Amino acid sequence: MALFIRFLLLPFYFLLIVMNLWQEIKESFREGSALTRLIYINLGVFLIIRITNVFYFLAGTPFPFLDWLALPADFSTLASRPWTLLTYMFLHFDFLHILFNLLWLFWMGQIFLAYFDQRKLVAIYVLGGICGGLFYIAGYNSFPVFNEIVTDSRLLGASASVIAIVTALAVHAPNHTLQLMFIGPVKMKYIALFSVVMYVIGISSSNAGGNLAHLGGAFWGVIYILQLRRGVDLGKWINNFFSGLKRLFRPSPKVKLSYRKPVDDIEYNRVKNQEKTRINEILDKISKSGYDSLSKEEKEILFRMGKE
């Protein structure tokens, strides 16, 4: 009898485990970095697509969602699905495709965040993906070799976004060295250069569209950093756009008096990272030249941060 009762309770135990897991995922997403959220979004879309595909397969009906989320090369199809220029970069269908893309994103994203704030990571991911999509569309509608397949071609995956991060790092920190398995230490500039050469060669392969998109992402990564050096953040508008969407769908808070301007999580983390970097610079200066070498402003910053 006790065994029978346990058997009946199994679905409830399973449901409890799922609910606890879902709660942990939500908390991790809410409290995680921009890199964590990008990875979660890609994984979430992948799982939803693959699970939904199972039901369509069992019903014996075509699976329509890839066509509605992947980026078409044909202009007329794109005009009816403009959102695909954004959705395609979060869309994967093959397990190995998403595995390698997310491993590459996790690895390069961590290095990127060592040099830049989270808002710039979001900007370069999204705009690198858009630039890659535009290269793909332009290539398929410009070169005669694609004339017969342009109407049926679709692009999906985060590869263009990831390679944008790689080339951005190669321009900003060309001598940053990575330890590659079976190879040893390799500088970032050589990793980016090798990748770009392989993408150019790969245009004549079966994945011509993907390689065109990779080149577009690589191009954006270079342009973004070069403009950033001139004091121009080409990705600022995309973060403002997402912040506006977040405020639009966020429930209205209760009205209360506040003398400080509220900031979102990304902005808060950006400010904290800047403060931390500034303090480290001041401490390094003290260790090298002593406390008396600090300027009046640096002493005030150190005093203020010590009180917090």
Task: Please provide the spans of the model-predicted regions.
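Terminal membrane-proximal soluble interaction domains of membrane-associated proteins
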Residues: 273-308
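A detector for small-residue-rich transmembrane helices and their helix-helix packing motifs
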Residues: 2-274, 278, 282
